[in-house]
Swiss-Prot record:
Presence of the UniProt keyword NADP in the record: no
Name by which UniProt lists this protein: Protein GOLVEN 8
Coiled-coil residue windows: none
Source organism of the structure: Arabidopsis thaliana
Signal sequence interval, chain numbering: 1-32
Inactivation phenotype: Shorter and fewer root hairs.
Length: 111
């Protein structure tokens, strides 16, 4: 085999490996959805049961309803419904416990 053909073969092989790595790296990030997840705080009983909320009725008007056709509050993923939105709602544990900024106590003066 000539030197120039060996160099072309090695370059082509390395380019193929590089492109394969790039394609595999970006393949895992796309799951066919729009990657917009709504973070909602729910009770610890539901978290311990491992349930994911599928549909949630907002408590304030500033929140956008995920599924406006739903009449009762919310429905879990293990309950069957024909009008469920396919967008999953993930639990945000910190939102449930957050009560605003905590006041800082004044530093003690050592005289």
């Amino acid at each position: 085999m000539k030197k120039w053909s060996y160099a072309k073969l090695m370059t082509s092989a390395l380019l193929l490996v590089f492109l394969s790595i790039i394609l595999l790296a970006f393949h895992g990030g796309s799951r066919g959805d729009n990657h917009l997840y709504d973070h909602v705080a729910i009770g610890t009983k539901d978290i311990l049961m491992g349930r994911k909320l599928k549909d949630l009725k907002p408590k304030t008007e500033s929140l956008k309803m995920i599924n406006p056709k739903k009449k009762n509050g919310f429905e879990y993923s293990d309950q069957v419904s024909s009008d469920l939105s396919r967008q999953e709602v993930f639990v945000d544990m910190m939102a449930r416990d957050y009560q605003g900024p905590k006041p800082r106590s004044k530093p003690l003066k050592n005289n």
